[in-house]
């Protein structure tokens, strides 16, 4: 009987223990949360200053923060949010840890403004303050209009306060503003004002297009000879001429002028295609006479031809 009672009480005891454990865990977690919130309120170091509550770390000593040279580094530090994974921040105290429930304190809520815009504005302000006097002077001088600069005879009030490097840069900027001289001279200005087709002055006035000016050479071939051509030995000749004297016809190979086209006679005045040795002769008889007197066209075939040479055609 006792064994049965002990066996039935064991499951009941385990059940009661399981029901009590969550309550105990919840109470312990609540106590830890209260302690952490109190520690955060009292031991939270000021922003931009190292933590004084944490134990010193001999292996990784923290260098002293330079407030003058670390202005840009403080802006991201103000906007940085502690990690939410439960690990303490580097260099902080070991007590500073987030609660296990995941709830964030009210003091670590996000700001209403965009953090990136705030970072950019802060960086621009710090960068403007960190610019040297020379760069700020150059940036202000570049913003001025080209005609609003001081006269050469006048001296600016801050010219004496500038360093030698700044004065040298100022002289360079002034020299760049001066108008540059034209390397081509007055001729270059004239060419720049003329259109690309200004070469028409080579053409004679009051003449149609294409008439060349004999006083201007167009390629070294002599005045009025065309683009880069050689002067003709006989201006009166025509294309394909082998004759030396001028005035001969096209393709004539005679040695004397006045011959007709294709004539191979040695004397001028011959007819076209004539191969006789004497010019102007197509018949041994005078011009207009084909047969001598007494001859007839109706000579019978049985009779011989008369011995006169005029009976035959030449």
Swiss-Prot record:
Residue stretches of biased makeup (Polar residues):
41-60
Q: Where is this region: Disordered?
A: 41-65, 77-96, 147-191, 292-314
Keyword Signal part of the UniProt annotation: yes
**Any single biological process term in GO:** extracellular matrix organization
Q: Where is the composition biased (Low complexity)?
A: 147-157
* Composition skew (Pro residues), residue ranges: 303-314
Q: What keywords sit in the KW lines?
A: Extracellular matrix, Secreted, Signal
So which residues are the signal peptide here? 1-26
Query: Does the keyword Signal belong to this entry?
Result: yes
Tissues where this protein is expressed: Taste cell specific.
- Top-level taxon in the UniProt lineage: Eukaryota
Q: Which PANTHER family match?
A: SIMILAR TO RIKEN CDNA 2300002M23, STG PROTEIN
- Give the protein's recorded name: Uncharacterized protein C6orf15 homolog
Chain's gene name:
STG
